Amino acid sequence: MANELKKYILSAHIVLMVLLFSACNGKSKTSFMQEGGDTLNLRYAENLQIVKYQHYTQVTLRNPWDTLKTLHTYLLVNKQDSCPSSLPEGTIVRVPLSNSLIFSSVHCGLLQELGALDKIKGVCDLQYIRVPAILESCRKKEITDAGSSMNPDIEKVIDMHPDGILLSPYENSGGYGRIEKLNIPILECADYMETSALGRAEWVRFYGLLFGKEAEADSLFAGVEEAYLSLRNQVKDITPKPTVITELKTGGTWYVPGGNSTMAKLYADAGARYIFADIPQSGSASLAFETVFDKGCLLYTSPSPRDRQKS
């Protein structure tokens, strides 16, 4: 039974990681209401809304830490078109992006799946990236290594002239420092704060719009959805449900996904019982090593030894 569950959990991980993998110069416009838009039907993503209008697409990100507020609004305008004179409030992004800076290894993998690796011109945290084509392009200096995502090399960022920066936002981060002053659209990828694996995966439709890969993104998500739901159905009646923990100890602290997180939902859908499912949050929680160790469990998932060695 344990081996069978490991297989299903691994399969679910693979399905998830397939994905998880300006002006006009990016300036904001004054606010007013628009009518007549076509809202995309998003079945799982709770923090994402996409509305298509004749001359632009409005993407609204709900603040996952305060769901009554908006995290960010983007107005996607095709590069081939003139920028409309009247737009609602939001950050204008000229699409498709062709010279992007990617902070997260997850989104590097995602762009590989979308066939958009040629749109990446810079990355951060190169030590965590496992995409051979990106590593080779960095070696050849075709892709810029901009250093740490926590403190990117601002001179390198300026030199590469990115048309968009994809990064993961954090609660109470205090902003993005000097990079915010470069007048480059910052795309806040809050997909990891969704409360289901399919909710996070559905953000691929947003990324498809950013990189001119809408059809590819829709097809990719449809395949992932079908595979995921099939796996979930295969294990829904398994009893007893084996216990599982995840992640690694960092220093004296063990960071674990909250009970409302994508990973917690993934384990539940895979037929397992996540031992910290009662932690009421979507992000990670910091626990003492002894607290985790004393729980005991049947299954344990973590980054590979190679990833751990290079992290």
What are these regions (language model features)?
Residues 1-30:
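Bacterial Sec-dependent N-terminal signal peptides
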Residues 24-108, 216-244:
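Bacterial Sec-exported substrate-binding components of ABC uptake systems
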Residues 65-158, 167-169:
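A short, structured surface patch at a secondary-structure boundary
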Residues 116, 182-183, 270:
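Short, structured coil segments at secondary-structure junctions
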Residues 142, 153, 159-166, 172-253, ...:
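Extracytoplasmic substrate-binding proteins
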Residues 151-161, 287-296:
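Short helices/loops that flank or line small-molecule/ion binding pockets
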Residues 258-259, 263-283:
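Alpha-helical, coiled-coil/dimerization segments enriched in small aliphatic residues
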Residues 300-305, 309:
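Conserved small/polar residues in nucleotide/adenosyl-binding loops
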